[in-house]
Design a protein with these regions (language model features):
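Conserved N-terminal alpha-helix of the aminotransferase class I/II PLP-enzyme fold
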Residues: 35-79
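N-terminal glycine-rich, Lys/His-bearing helix-loop that initiates the first secondary-structure elements
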Residues: 1-47
């Protein structure tokens, strides 16, 4: 894939229901946990997931994956 294509589409798979190709903006600051153990596992980094929007959120996750793909890396970190 060309870098221009990766810059626009990398790190995101279109929603299967809506077929939307634009990355959604999640207007939330907190995420629900399945139970207390799930919350503990998230904070201990035992499982991947969203905890709090300043730490990780789906929109930043796409940015990190997209930049990593453009640079040939395995991961990224948006600060």
């Amino acid at each position: 894939m060309k870098i221009e294509t990766i810059a626009v589409h990398g790190g995101y798979t279109p929603d299967p229901t809506t077929k939307a190709v634009a990355v959604p903006i999640y207007q939330t600051v907190a995420y629900a946990f399945d139970n207390t153990q799930h919350g503990a596992d998230l904070f201990d980094l035992k499982v991947a997931g969203n905890i709090y929007s300043r730490i990780m959120n789906p929109t930043n996750g796409v940015l990190e994956a997209r930049v990593a793909a453009m640079e040939g890396g395995v991961g990224g970190l948006a600060v």
